[in-house]
Amino acid sequence: MKKDALLYPLRNTHNTDDTPALWNWAQNSVVGQRQQLHQPRNEAELQQLLRDSHGKVRVLGSRLSPGRMLCVQPQDVLLDLSALRGILAQDEESVTFAAGTPLQQVYDSLTKMDRMLASSPGVIAVQTLAGALATGTHGQGLAQSSLADEALHIRMVLADGSVREFQRGDADFPAAMVSLGALGIVTAITLRTQPFRLFTCHKFAASADSLEQDLLTWNEQHELSKAWWFVDDNLMHVWNADVASAEDSQAWYDHQREVIEHGDQADSSLNDTIDQTLEHMHRDTQIHGKGGKQFRTVTRFRDFTDISGDIYQLFCRGIAVPQINVEIGVPLAKTPEIISKIKAWYAQNRPHMHYPIILRCTGASQAWMSPAHQQPTCFFGFVVYYADDGSLSQDGLHFLTEVEKLLAAEGGRPHWGKYYDPQRYQWRAIYPQWDAFRAVREQLDPTHRFSNDYVTALFD
């Protein structure tokens, strides 16, 4: 089998709801059989299941990750923790959620309490809370880091059914923060919260000529910053957000807590670039003329305007469409040099650009296995959407391969819940606490019950 087919598998476009095989969300990988799936109703049932069963154990979460992270052998166990959801406890500064709570429910619950997390959200919120922590899910902004960095307490059921409580400050807490599901089954997470705030997001288009300096400036001067790099046109679309003024905040409340759009005239300066991007995407994805949700991810950049709202309304606006998503975090200090190298490589090779490059920067993470561990980080994100026949643009995949090669050579660390080529990385060299994490794993799961082929290849 070709390497591309292993890294970027084709998609099954048929309905799989009634099949014996259980697929991941993108339907590009069978993770096991439905008869292997267990759905404990509470922690006690989970403990008993672990005591009574044999074989390896993996948690499915929302099944958004590549299949290799989830898949098990016929004798193994798959867990669905969707029954473990909702608020378990709260005090003035924190809220404890069950591990299977979807992020959208977490965000909605906090908003109703007039609270929020210090970490800004990613673009979608269908992930489970525990799954988002385990894979290092993050948003944008140098004053914050991953979702896992807001955890104060993590409750975990171990392979023998016993319970281990991790508290912030414990020597091994940084291992539990981003664990890849390799230590135990998380059942509850306490998140620190802060008072609810509103933001105004200023959107604009700019040349990418000085992106090397501009990206750092945007992130240093604004609480939250996100950018899309349309390399073909040498253009940027930028969202910079800061705390909303009293006037904008009042307008939001007067508008029934809905997003406020500012300005009578929308900015159309990106429209030609958007049309060109849509042409590329249409050629790459419309084999039979079906589907089309992927187009909405860029049509929203047409006729843009500044907006005000809560942090989730502004940034958690993604459209979940099956895709190959590669995201590599590099040291922020090296980012200007890396941008220059991408520009030079593009000028020399003129690769096919399926989608703009997404740029999000975060502060350093305390989690040993976070791609942002110990260093402010710029995440370069790349997307190739599946065609309606389940195929992928070969030119788009070639670009993914080459740009990952470039970023890996610069000390890049891949997002665990997305696609990457493991052969490109020397894990010990890029993760200072790699062996410390392995030692915690040996202590908590000496028989490696929470492993599969993917986890074994990583750590053994």
Give residue spans per PLM region.
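Noncatalytic alpha-helical scaffold of FAD-dependent oxidoreductases
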Residues: 1-460
